[in-house]
Amino acid sequence: MSLWSSVKFAQRYAQLPKVFYRLVTPQPLDNNRWVIWNGELAQGFALPKHADDPQLLSVFSGAEPFSAFKPLAMKYAGHQFGVYNPDLGDGRGLLLGEMQNQQGQWFDIHLKGAGLTPFSRMGDGRAVLRSTLREYLCSEAMAALGIETTRALGMMVSDTPVYREQVEQGACLIRLAQTHIRFGHFEHFFYTEQYDELRLLADNVIEWYMPECTAHDKPYLAMFEQVVARTATMIAQWQAVGFAHGVMNTDNMSILGQTFDYGPFGFLDDYEPGYICNHSDYQGRYAFDQQPRVALWNLSALAHALSPLIERDDLELALAQYEPTLGKVFSQLMRQKLGLLSQQEGDSELFNAMFALLAENHTDYTRFFRTLSQLDREDEQTVIDLFIDRDAAHGWLSRYLERVAMEQTASGEAKSAQQRCEQMRAVNPKYILRNYLAQQAIDKAQQGDFSEVHTLAKLLKNPYDEQAEMEAYAHLPPEWGKKMVISCSS
């Protein structure tokens, strides 16, 4: 029985006119070998759990031609740090084709680090071990946290030298995503006045990903409304979990509201609203607390690109739904994190007082919520001890517990502290991919030891579980590991 006999492939994007892409032959790395294969994800596509068959490596690395694949580099544009750049496209990654999972959903197969393309500009078309490991681990960590994201099927390392600030090992990532269509795809066709192609792109987005929009009187408007809602939801999830993307250019924004293009990202350690994780972000444009604003800016840029298809008034009305949607979803997530069942007057003030307290005391964001989730097992003092200003912490905690008691009294189904805390532990992770943990795995991997990569990958699949034997990974970061800023070079 063939390795591929049960796998369903397609090449829908390759059926579009040639102006949408360029066909490119992958340039395999030297002595490619697996670092990690995501067996659980692979099984969902009828692929084997273990990557023992050498054909898996040769096909997914691009070393062996495969009839189901038609490798191509997409053309797009985008606003980078607010400045329009028309000269973008897949500069080091290739869309190989699509696979269908067992739920009937199609996923793009994208090989990142596949070599030069017509859109490589001054680059070499390669990805390095360091950044590839970070993307693999973070995309899978985000999926386990329940946040919309691209996925990682596997990654490889090679003997090919890649020249960045220093010589590094070349690597490749097999990224799966429901689409690789970005805001920047629409911007490219708009700014080059290729309006027929703009319409064709919108038609295919609707057909492939949002077929329900066809029943709408204004299907293009319905499509944009979905993009707005999905983006608002994604940003609310980022802010709730403490995730900073680092480089929210419009070419890094998925039209399906999925976290996309992991680069200089970071999870909050101490709660610092203005946290900047990208060392190239000198102005703090993409700081943690700016992400909601930037996403709206990006949606406005997309709206401008869609103006040949959608009336201006309709675009403005759709954009006006972004902030209410973001606020509603974020408040729901905060109530879940605090174990509150219902919405009550004064909740916003409670949240704002909490954020102010966390910021003033430089309290670890993830540990605070996880400790609050342990109040059925621990004394209140364990929460208060997280803060420098213990009196202020005691005051907020008393207010919070009054809010919990008031809800239980007012509601018909009062929950016990144990029930409430169990529900809180299911939404407040114990383990996140702190930058220092990723760096420790990278340091070992660069010496040829991938054990820490596998340890982290296993740990982060179940971020809400106690995993007592892994307790050290929940510790606060050492001083050198706090507020790490990451390079965009990958």
UniProtKB/Swiss-Prot annotation:
The keyword Cell division does not apply. Mg(2+) binds at residues 252, 261. The keyword Membrane does not apply. The active site is at residue 251. Its EC number is 2.7.7.-, 2.7.7.108. It is an enzyme of class 2 (transferase). InterPro entries: SelO. ATP binds at residues 89, 91-92, 112, 124-125, 175, 182, 261. It catalyses: L-seryl-[protein] + ATP = 3-O-(5'-adenylyl)-L-seryl-[protein] + diphosphate; L-threonyl-[protein] + ATP = 3-O-(5'-adenylyl)-L-threonyl-[protein] + diphosphate; L-tyrosyl-[protein] + ATP = O-(5'-adenylyl)-L-tyrosyl-[protein] + diphosphate; L-histidyl-[protein] + UTP = N(tele)-(5'-uridylyl)-L-histidyl-[protein] + diphosphate. Keywords: ATP-binding, Magnesium, Manganese, Metal-binding, Nucleotide-binding, Nucleotidyltransferase, Transferase. Its cofactor is Mg(2+); Mn(2+). One of its GO terms (molecular function) is ATP binding. NCBIfam families: PRK00029.1 (NF000658). Nucleotidyltransferase involved in the post-translational modification of proteins. It can catalyze the addition of adenosine monophosphate (AMP) or uridine monophosphate (UMP) to a protein, resulting in modifications known as AMPylation and UMPylation. Belongs to the SELO family. This is Protein nucleotidyltransferase YdiU. It comes from Vibrio vulnificus (strain CMCP6). The lineage of its organism: Bacteria, Pseudomonadati, Pseudomonadota, Gammaproteobacteria, Vibrionales. The gene is ydiU.
